[in-house]
Amino acid sequence: MTADSLFQHSPEKPPAWLLGQLELLVRRRASGRAGHALIVTSDDIEEASLFCHLLASQEFCAGVPDASACGQCANCRAFSQGVHGDFFVIRRSEGKVFIGIDQIRQATQALQQTPLYGSIKVVLIEAADQMTLPAANSLLKMLEEPPGNSLLLLTTAAIWHLPPTVRSRCQRLSLSPPTAEQAQHWLQAGRGMDAEAARRALQLSDGKAISAFTLEREGSLSMLQALVQSFDQADLSLGPPAIWSKVSVPYLLEGLLLWVESRSRGTVQDGHAVDANWLRLHLCLGELSDRVKRGATPAQDILVAEVYRLYRNCGHKSFERTCSRFLASLGEVNLSG
C-alpha cells in the first residue's frame, strides 16, 4: 500500500502527532514564508509520504484555508480518488533500483503545462535518495528555475544520501515521531485495528505507525513475523533459515537490522563485549543494506550465506576481526555499489 491509497481512507483527518507541524507549514505557505521546494524527512518513509499527501491536498482544496482539506470540493474529491491532474508522484518503478532521469524529465514537462484544476501544480518524489546522479542533476534545474506556480516535495529517511546541491536548494522539515500511546491509539481508533494486532504491528515495524498500518493492510505482517522468528531461531539451525531465500534482499536486511537493534538494546549477558559485537554486526548489515540501496546486486544465495555466517559468529571473541575481513571483502561478492 502506498500513501496514495492510505490517504484515500480518511483524507480529512491527519494523524494527531502530525497536525501541529502541518498547521505551521500551512501558515508559513499562506504568508509566503515557505519556499517552492521542501524535503520532508522521517525514519518512517511512509509517514513522510502521507504528510506530503496531506500538504498537497490542502494546497489544492478550494474550501476554507486550514491544515485539513475540506474533503468535499471538486479538488478534494479528485485528489482523494487519485485522479487529480495537477499532482504528480515519482517513485522507483517496480523492478528498478533507482529513480531515473527520464522520470524527473517527465515531471519537469508536466509542471510546465497550465494547471488543470486551479493555480498550482505539485510534484512529490518519494524516497528521493533513490535518485540516480543524472536524475538528481536534472532535478537541480527544476529547483533553480521552478516552472510557474509549483511545489516540489521530496521524502527521505536518509537525507545524507541526497546530493548536497539538492539539499542546499530545499527547505527541510523533520517530522516528529508519535509516542507509543499515540501510535497505538491511531491504529486502533483511526484505523480499526484491535489492540493486539496494533501492538504486534508496531513491534514488528519498530514503532513506525504508518508503516505498521501499511504492513497490516498489505498482509505482510505474517511474513515479517515469520522472518523475525527465524532470526530468533537461526542459531539453532544447521544453515540459513529457508525464509531468508524467499524474501527480497532489501527486505531481509531491513528486517535483520531492526532485529539486531532490538536485540542489542535488550542484551544483558556478558556486559560490554556482547553489546559491542551486536553493534559490529549492525555495522556490517548497515553497510550491506546501504550498498544494495545504491545499486549493488549480490547473488542472494551468497549474501544469505555470508549474513548467516556473520550472525552465527556474533558471540565469538574474534568477531571484531571477522567483521573487519567481511567489510574489506564486500567488493568480492559484487557489493561494491
Model-derived features: positions:
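AAA+/P-loop NTPase substrate/partner-engagement loops
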Residues: A69-I99, W160
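Flexible beta-alpha connector loops of hexameric P-loop NTPases
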Residues: E94-I101, A128, R172-L173
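Charged, glycine-rich active-site and insertion segments that engage polyanionic ligands
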Residues: M1-C61, D66, N75-A78, G148-S150, ...
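Structural motif
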Residues: V122-L124, L153
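Conserved catalytic/switch belt of AAA+ P-loop NTPases
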Residues: N137-L154
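Conserved Walker B
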Residues: A127-M131, I159
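Short loop/turn elements that form and flank the Walker-type P-loop nucleotide-binding site
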Residues: R33-A34, S80-H84, L116-S119, P146-N149
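Conserved alpha-helical scaffold flanking the Walker A/P-loop in AAA+ ATPase domains
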Residues: E23-R29, F98-V122, Q130, P134-M142
